[in-house]
């Protein structure tokens, strides 16, 4: 008896399941209203011709959508309709599809619209010549160019587009162009979320504006607040400054960028190249800092001046540029090298300062970090060393050493050394070579 009950219950459930499937697959298109009904089996076999009157359009409904048009051909056996003239398809209270022509299959729930197609949702408008709308998948698709308008200022053009209604996401492919009054984005593929304005691009992409040009092959841009994050072959051009890095964060409103890993910053105005592994660039303030194996190379006539340290801070415009190198700073030049805890170079007065670390630290550690310079056969040390460069030629003009000045010089025979010490030291250069020295107070040799 128990087996019979189970079999009966299973059979009933199976019958109900098949009934549900059958009902779902055969939901019929409903004709809600029309001005005129007619049949013409000679011209339109098996079709009912529905036409509007002076007051109202033809109204049709099917499983959650309502349709209006001037005229419709209804194929009841096929559960299929063709609509003509000022067609409107409305799904819920958020999706409106306008066109001049519409085909709709009640069994597959697939619609095809053509002629001045306009798809409207709360955050965007899609314009195209023809569009497929799959209600089962809740996807709309075009393949013959379309334009999406967002908030009356952003437009996105592409040859192919796919809109996922549930995710509020567009997928654009081939010749994609996003236009904004401030910038343009050209890319082969772009995913765009209408609700939050986030754009994700794939492949060679350019973002152009008056203030900057950006290139990457994988990235993201927030069209609502004008910030972006770019990876893979990332490059940002700020007029005369080019930033290359593995990844770059960008804020258009602040004219700010931060970069990470394998950074190279080219400054064509000041003729220098800066490298490191993390940097922040404040273009409006003409400033930046770079850290993690930071190095800056500045062109000086036929030579280059290199400054290397843990962190480098650069501020000021071309005439007032200041370079500050912190912690384990080193300087290299064809005829000069040196190191200190910190190096401070001011282009406006041509002074480069080699600064000792805090004197309150352990004496042995302090002495090991004392500034030191090498120039041809000379080695110079002191608590603080100041080099003065000629501003026009960038040649070294003079030298000042404050406190515990010491100079070691190889003698003219090359067999020994001369050494001089004192409280302070002054030196003069000729063709970048130290030629004369004056010791101030407590001179010893």
Name these PLM-found stretches:
Residues 1-27:
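Bacterial Sec-dependent N-terminal signal peptides
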């Amino acid at each position: 008896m128990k087996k019979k009950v189970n079999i009966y219950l299973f059979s009933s459930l199976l019958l109900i399941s098949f009934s549900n499937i059958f009902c779902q697959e055969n939901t019929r298109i409903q004709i809600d209203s029309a001005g005129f009904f007619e049949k013409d089996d000679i011209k339109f076999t098996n079709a009912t011709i529905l036409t509007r009157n002076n007051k109202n359009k033809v109204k049709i409904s099917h499983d959650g959508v309502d349709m209006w048009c001037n005229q419709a051909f209804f194929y009841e056996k096929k559960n299929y309709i063709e609509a003509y003239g000022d067609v409107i398809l409305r799904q819920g209270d958020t999706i409106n599809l306008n066109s001049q022509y519409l085909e709709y299959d009640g069994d597959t729930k697939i619609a095809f619209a053509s002629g001045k197609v306009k798809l409207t949702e709360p955050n965007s408008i899609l314009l195209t010549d023809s569009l497929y709308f799959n209600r089962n998948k809740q996807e709309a698709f075009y393949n013959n160019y379309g334009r999406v308008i967002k908030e009356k200022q952003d437009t996105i053009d592409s040859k192919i587009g796919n809109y996922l209604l549930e995710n509020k996401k567009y997928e654009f492919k081939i010749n994609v162009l996003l236009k904004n009054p401030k910038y343009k984005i050209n890319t082969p593929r772009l995913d765009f979320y209408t609700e939050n304005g986030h754009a994700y691009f794939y492949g060679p992409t350019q973002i152009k504006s008056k203030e900057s040009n950006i290139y990457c092959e994988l990235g993201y841009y927030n069209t609502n607040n004008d910030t972006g994050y770019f990876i893979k072959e990332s490059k940002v051009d700020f007029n005369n400054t080019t930033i290359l890095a593995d990844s770059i964060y960008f804020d258009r409103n602040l004219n700010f960028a931060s970069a990470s890993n394998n950074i190279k910053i080219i400054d064509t105005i000041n003729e220098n190249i800066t490298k490191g592994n993390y940097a922040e660039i404040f273009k409006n303030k003409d400033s930046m800092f770079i850290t993690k194996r930071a190095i800056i190379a500045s062109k000086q006539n036929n030579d280059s001046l290199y400054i290397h340290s843990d962190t480098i801070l650069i501020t000021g415009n071309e005439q007032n540029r200041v370079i500050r190198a912190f912690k384990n700073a080193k300087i290299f030049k064809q005829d000069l090298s040196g190191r200190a805890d910190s190096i401070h170079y001011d282009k406006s007065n041509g002074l480069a300062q080699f600064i000792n670390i805090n004197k309150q630290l352990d004496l042995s550690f302090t002495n090991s970090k004392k500034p030191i310079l090498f120039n041809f056969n000379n080695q110079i040390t002191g608590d603080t060393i100041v080099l003065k460069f000629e501003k026009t030629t960038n040649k070294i003009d003079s030298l000042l050493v404050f406190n515990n000045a010491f100079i070691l010089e190889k003698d003219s025979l090359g067999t020994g050394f001369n050494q001089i010490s004192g409280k302070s030291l002054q030196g003069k250069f000729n063709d970048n070579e130290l030629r004369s020295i004056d010791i101030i107070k407590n001179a010893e040799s």
